[in-house]
Design a protein with these regions (language model features):
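Loop-to-helix entry region of an early transmembrane alpha helix in multi-pass inner-membrane enzymes
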Residues: 29-33, 42-62, 94-98
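Short helix- or helix-capping micro-motifs
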Residues: 78-89, 134, 138, 152
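Transmembrane-helix signature of polytopic, membrane-embedded enzymes
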Residues: 64-87, 105-106, 125
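Membrane-interface alpha helices of multi-pass inner-membrane proteins
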Residues: 19, 114, 126-142, 148
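Membrane-interface transmembrane helices that cradle and orient dolichyl/undecaprenyl
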Residues: 69-72, 111-127
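Short acidic/glycine- and proline-prone juxtamembrane loop motifs at membrane-interface regions
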Residues: 90-104
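Perimembrane helix-loop-helix junctions
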Residues: 114-120, 134, 147-170
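Extracytoplasmic catalytic/substrate-binding loops of multi-pass membrane glycan-assembly enzymes
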Residues: 2-13, 22-38, 43-48
């Protein structure tokens, strides 16, 4: 349908998705795994591949909505916050690019939602899910280590958060 093609990094990620592995030269494997599954379902056409980041951005927007609700926003303002994310220039322009940042942002946001739930409810299930989602974050981009460092700083500075984590039986 079009003469457009993937950018260099996007083509590299797509090639990785054709040869799945446990890791690649400079990146963890999760984006390639997701693209491989996505391509298997929807094909390898340019239009199909370019809709992948759009779908992920809508999941990120929903995670932002849930994060805002956990931060005590009302539903209307949480929806506005999620919508604002979709229309800010950085997000709206990058929503057409296949990159490791997509999945990192998704799992980072979900991790924040789960962290708030752990602090508020001290739920073992949410604590387990937080670890799982953080693991997915690390499999999407190594920069997820900064979430863990921020979490350690939070636990050091905020006694309530530390108490919630310490009291968790997991």
């Amino acid at each position: 349908f079009t003469d457009f093609s993937l950018y260099g990094d996007e083509a590299q990620y797509w090639l990785w998705s054709q040869n799945l592995d446990l890791g690649y030269y400079s990146k963890p494997p999760l984006l390639a795994w997701f693209l491989g599954g996505y391509s298997g379902l929807f094909g390898d056409s340019f239009i199909s591949l370019k809709t992948f980041p759009l779908i992920v951005y809508f999941f990120i927007s929903y995670a932002i909505y849930k994060l805002c609700l956990n931060l005590s926003f009302d539903k209307k303002n949480a929806k506005l916050c999620a919508l604002n994310f979709l229309i800010i220039p950085a997000a709206s322009l990058s929503s057409f690019l296949i990159s490791t940042d997509l999945l990192l942002l998704l799992f980072w946001t979900i991790s924040m939602v789960l962290l708030l739930k752990v602090i508020k409810t001290n739920s073992t299930l949410n604590f387990f899910l937080l670890g799982l989602v953080l693991g997915l974050g690390f499999l999407s981009k190594y920069a997820a280590i900064y979430f863990l460092l921020s979490l350690l700083l939070l636990l050091f500075l905020d006694r309530t958060s530390l108490k919630s984590v310490r009291n968790n039986p997991l």
